[in-house]
Amino acid sequence: MLSRSLNKVVTSIKSSSIIRMSSATAAATSAPTANAANALKASKAPKKGKLQVSLKTPKGTKDWADSDMVIREAIFSTLSGLFKKHGGVTIDTPVFELREILAGKYGEDSKLIYNLEDQGGELCSLRYDLTVPFARYVAMNNIQSIKRYHIAKVYRRDQPAMTKGRMREFYQCDFDVAGTFESMVPDSECLSILVEGLTSLGIKDFKIKLNHRKILDGIFQIAGVKDEDVRKISSAVDKLDKSPWEAVKKEMTEEKGQSEETADKIGEYVKLNGSLKEIHAVLSADANITSNEKAKQGLDDIATLMKYTEAFDIDSFISFDLSLARGLDYYTGLIYEVVTSASAPPENASELKKKAKSAEDASEFVGVGSIAAGGRYDNLVNMFSEASGKKSTQIPCVGISFGVERIFSLIKQRINSSTTIKPTATQVFVMAFGGGKDWTGYLPERMKVTKQLWDAGIEAEYVYKAKANPRKQFDAAEKAGCHIAVILGKEEYLEGKLRVKRLGQEFADDDGELVSAADIVPIVQEKLSQIHEDGLNEVTRLIKGL
Amino acid sequence: MLSRSLNKVVTSIKSSSIIRMSSATAAATSAPTANAANALKASKAPKKGKLQVSLKTPKGTKDWADSDMVIREAIFSTLSGLFKKHGGVTIDTPVFELREILAGKYGEDSKLIYNLEDQGGELCSLRYDLTVPFARYVAMNNIQSIKRYHIAKVYRRDQPAMTKGRMREFYQCDFDVAGTFESMVPDSECLSILVEGLTSLGIKDFKIKLNHRKILDGIFQIAGVKDEDVRKISSAVDKLDKSPWEAVKKEMTEEKGQSEETADKIGEYVKLNGSLKEIHAVLSADANITSNEKAKQGLDDIATLMKYTEAFDIDSFISFDLSLARGLDYYTGLIYEVVTSASAPPENASELKKKAKSAEDASEFVGVGSIAAGGRYDNLVNMFSEASGKKSTQIPCVGISFGVERIFSLIKQRINSSTTIKPTATQVFVMAFGGGKDWTGYLPERMKVTKQLWDAGIEAEYVYKAKANPRKQFDAAEKAGCHIAVILGKEEYLEGKLRVKRLGQEFADDDGELVSAADIVPIVQEKLSQIHEDGLNEVTRLIKGL
């Protein structure tokens, strides 16, 4: 009867499956995610055959497990500790928002938003970042000031480059400060958090590219760009990290209708980069800049910022780079993004792109991109307040976002053959040794002892088998990376005794210590505290780059 | 220029907004989520007026913040610690799956699945639970055995009852064991985890209702239910927690075509409940049961289970209840769910339901429902293996799921006026006191000192203001719940001294201690370790129900 109902379910899986494939295709889809591209193609060319489901995750997404998961959790815990250290509180917003909340915030990237199907009720979309939901939250709850952090997944229907950490579902770790404060103070704290965060993740060779939207806007005015052309010229400038100036200039003049002179004038400025001090000095000596209202405002901000980055001792990480534009609509002041040597695409990227067999994954011909980014957005909260009919109140905001998957891909490169990362937390393995005709295997007895350890907060396991030979139990203990075995000897246990033994190669010849079963918890606790005295574990070493 | 581009964005928000509302309606929508129902209604009756967005989260979802967030994070940390204690590793699967993966797994509840819009590419749906993605993961990676835990959001388009923790987006905290093991061993460990988890969350008055699908199937056979009717009769039995036997009997006979005798026979059995021992004894003495192959298999499992629940000392929490059926298709063995006194709907539920003004939220007339649940599903992994064209291999599974929002709603009830939960982790507030014409406010200096504390891992804040009077700084420190103030006195700081002062009512008259600026880090560390010696903080007390 039961099996009938199961058959029904299996049939229903099969009949509801949208994709028809031949058995040959199915074999291909059972390979790991890397083959997703092939699977997708195959699914679009249905062949005659058995109805089947493809065992894969959707394009641009993946399962996280084993030591990868341990490393990623360690990154989260490092960053959330950092955010808390700076007085951050955390919030959690829904993974989807009303569609209208996301509309008009992301410029050309709006096409990358995932929509939920209209199944009746409200129209919703998956969030594209954590910034817009944060601004919606601040406006909705009339919050005047908050420092909040948020670690959560966001969604973009972009071309994935999985091994470079560019995915369709990925985590952002955001810290934002909302509220009216002394100019550049929360901004410089955000920059300090960038430095502290990356340094504590063992990333040292990074550079914070920084610019100011007002300076950029001033430059465009000076160069003679019309107001209505600013956004499209800004998005041309934004390509300077990937394209040479000549290509960008061509885009400005041939595609975007600017004169040769305008383009050249922009070119003079956007080629500038150096320390805050250097570029500030250059711009301060430029009468065009100092006489342009917007550019002057931006330049004054930079002067203020310099006092604070010096107090935080983070100057050396910052490169004031006038070519940085950033695509998003909502930025109004400082903008910044963090790059490392892995951020840039390979030198022969365009060749590799041509050679790449499939465009489903771009890992072969792209770089990791920026690993963190942020900026000031002073009007976003008020847009929501006004658009919802609330009283207009400006709540200025500034924030940063760490790209965890990209940082993860850098940390992964540090792993060498000697790094062993244990995915379980298990400390103690409870075993039973015995034999003979009347030997039961002490399964309920092992459970009882294990339960005592659990109740004391100690991570403990035992094998799920009535009778297991010592070898199998030691193997299981080793696989779990346990430090200690608690052994129920057939005779010893009857006498109220347990054997406590250190595990590991160097203790192979050590029979351990026979102790009173009544004292097992304090004895194990004492041994564990000795073992853990030596400090850092492998994950911490890896994360910190030690 | 900038403001023009912003105007463009605002216009784009407005023109892209789907919902048109009058200003009056907009005022209503600016109220918190409780008014979501009204807002939705309003949005369905467009009126003439300004284009607007409604500042709300989608129906059945909410933002989490402040002390609620602290409490929920403490629940997660308690449960993940518990899962690790039992040797669990964690995995993370995408929030959406290929639609075909979810098809045919949830019986009548399949209609509650959220679909993603078809924007080209694969058809996907938001996950409905964590169990099906887990089984997909196990099958896809040919995993033979794993203990995994997963704490993540799931999605169901159900009627929400927000204050009872019944939401459309909610967390599940799952622990599952996959692999072929000694009968009932992982099952009893899952039950032990239920007891350990709820107890450590301060929930003591709960009952684990437990049944066995094979016994239930045997009973249906004994009563004369035809094989093809089993699922629908099972789903009638499943309603016994909400409806009286008479109503269920009526459904069986009048709607579902069973004879009076069959229904009465089922009734005899499903009314049985008591301890494992009691009901096991009753069923063992029943020749109908012992001679039915399926029922006998189930009964043997129960006998084995009893040995282990005794070893784990959890018998007293279990009620063997033959009326428990559970709706999901995939269970094959033990099934269980945890209820408390808050689980049941109010006694006058149907009256309240009639009175309730809106059916958008059911909080007024429903109970919290079960707060945790689970069971054995031995065929789900193999369904995926077979349907994907892989070799058929049975990987038996058993698991449990904690309903965090429901547990949260129980813990919230413990909060009384004296409970203060601090949403930030900030320990130290860095202040500057001074005055006079030449007083700068020591902002960069405060930053420098704060940075020293951050670098030593100490949670520290300062006010984001060039000059702030002492009152404002103390207020900010108090708001952040700080224990210590580090004060830069105008003269003292110039002499290389800092003042360290305990905060709080009882230290109001204490001027603190003047120390050398060079020693500030160890001195603050020492003071903090003294302060935290007294142990448990308010959140821990609240979570543990102390």
UniProtKB/Swiss-Prot annotation, chains A, B:
SUPFAM superfamilies attached to this UniProt entry: Class II aaRS ABD-related, Class II aaRS and biotin synthetases
Catalyzed reaction equations: tRNA(His) + L-histidine + ATP = L-histidyl-tRNA(His) + AMP + diphosphate + H(+)
Binding positions for L-histidine per the UniProt entry: 129-131, 156, 172, 176, 326, 330-331
Any GO CC annotation of this UniProt entry: mitochondrion
Keyword Cell inner membrane: no
Spans through the membrane: none
Organelle targeting peptide span: 1-20
Keywords carried by this UniProt record: Aminoacyl-tRNA synthetase, ATP-binding, Cytoplasm, Ligase, Mitochondrion, Nucleotide-binding, Protein biosynthesis, Transit peptide
Any one GO BP annotation for this protein: histidyl-tRNA aminoacylation
Top-level EC class: ligase
UniProt-listed Enzyme Commission number(s): 6.1.1.21
Additional detail: Present with 26800 molecules/cell in log phase SD medium.
Function: Catalyzes the aminoacylation of histidyl-tRNA in both the cytoplasm and the mitochondrion.
Family from the record: Belongs to the class-II aminoacyl-tRNA synthetase family.
PANTHER family: HISTIDINE--TRNA LIGASE (PTHR11476:SF7), HISTIDYL-TRNA SYNTHETASE (PTHR11476)
Name recorded for this polypeptide: Histidine--tRNA ligase, mitochondrial
Name of the encoding gene: HTS1
